Amino acid sequence: MAWKRTVSVKALENAGGQIAVNVDGNVIFIARGKDGLHGLNAVCSHARCILGIFEEDTMTVRCSCHGARFEVTTGKMIEPPSVAPNAPMEKLGLKVYNVRDNAGFLEVDVD
């Protein structure tokens, strides 16, 4: 495992429980859900937009450009983009990352 320190837990709280961070050139979306911290690639696999709308009740994140929706625990696309309703969802998932709180800072396992 290669844990990389990102931002403080306070920054996540100040951002409403969701934040995008840059880790070694990868933009990672981090959200605090009902079952802990989750991280996934923050760049939508459809049009390369940054994800931005975390829905805690469904544990999903929505792309702000075209509405594609991804599970934060698996990265699986569960709703296609509105402009491409026939997109091959099984091929458009996102990489997930382990995230932890280490002494008040969020760390992401980049392996």
Curated annotation (Swiss-Prot):
Record has Iron as a keyword: yes
Record gene name: sdx
Cofactor binding summary note: Binds 1 [2Fe-2S] cluster per subunit.
Subcellular location: Cytoplasm
NCBIfam families on file: SDX_Thmprot
KW Cytoplasm (keyword) present: yes
Assigned keywords, A-Z: 2Fe-2S, Cytoplasm, Electron transport, Iron, Iron-sulfur, Metal-binding, Oxidoreductase, Transport
Organism classification: Archaea, Methanobacteriati, Thermoplasmatota, Thermoplasmata, Thermoplasmatales
Residues covered by the Rieske domain: 3-108
Classification via Pfam families: Rieske
Gene3D superfamilies (UniProt xref): Rieske [2Fe-2S] iron-sulphur domain (2.102.10.10)
GO molecular function: 2 iron, 2 sulfur cluster binding; metal ion binding; oxidoreductase activity
GO cellular component: cytoplasm
Cofactor(s), names only, from the UniProt record: [2Fe-2S] cluster
Superkingdom: Archaea
Disulfide bonds: none
Name of the protein: Probable sulredoxin
Source organism of the structure: Thermoplasma acidophilum (strain ATCC 25905 / DSM 1728 / JCM 9062 / NBRC 15155 / AMRC-C165)
Family classification: Belongs to the SDX family.
Cited SUPFAM superfamilies: ISP domain (SSF50022)
Positions annotated to bind [2Fe-2S] cluster: 44, 46, 63, 66
Location (main, coarse): cytoplasm
